[in-house]
Amino acid sequence: MKVLFLTIALSLFSILQAQDSSSSEEQFEGTYFVKAIVTDSEFFEKNKPKALSPLTVTHLSNGDLEAKFTTNMNGICEEIKMKFEKTDKPGIFSTNDGSRQVLIEKTSVRDHWILFCEGELHGMQVRIAKLLGPHTDENPKAFQEFKKFVSLKRFNEEKINIPRQTETCIPEHV
């Protein structure tokens, strides 16, 4: 259960860490769905979540991000909150004392983002890329841009996963 939790948390943390601090008109903030995900880590391949709940991202006044999502493991709903600290590099945030970094790239499709996470987990280097969007509807143009990004970062395109979307559960302690 801890491995599954870590898998989901790392997977979703990378979603949360991304806002370009440049003068972009759009901000990475609001509710997003993971539309596609790819990794080169066997650990994540074996433990990838089959369904993901929406992610709510809030831009904090100091430039950091806070993200919230829920996970339902063995019938128990839990809300996860994470804080991601901005770095001196535009578009890059860190977490876990800097052991993980996420780069965010805006696609040409409104409100669609590509997140690229690199870091260490259990002594292994892990790379994950995700396509996020505000709705569960497919967007072929955004997906094509994601595939191009995946290819440029030398991921195996055949390992792109389209996760099932699930509703946010309500934790008992709320």
UniProtKB/Swiss-Prot annotation:
Gene3D superfamilies: 2.40.128.20. Its main location: secreted. Keywords: Disulfide bond, Milk protein, Secreted, Signal, Transport. Disulfide bonds join 77-169. Residues 1-18 form the signal peptide. It is found in: Secreted. InterPro entries: Calycin (IPR012674), Lipocalin (IPR002345), Lipocln_cytosolic_FA-bd_dom (IPR000566), von_Ebner_gland (IPR002450). It comes from the Eukaryota. GO terms for cellular component: extracellular space. GO terms for molecular function: small molecule binding. It holds the Pfam family Lipocalin. This is Late lactation protein B. The lineage of its organism: Eukaryota, Metazoa, Chordata, Craniata, Vertebrata. The gene is LLPB.
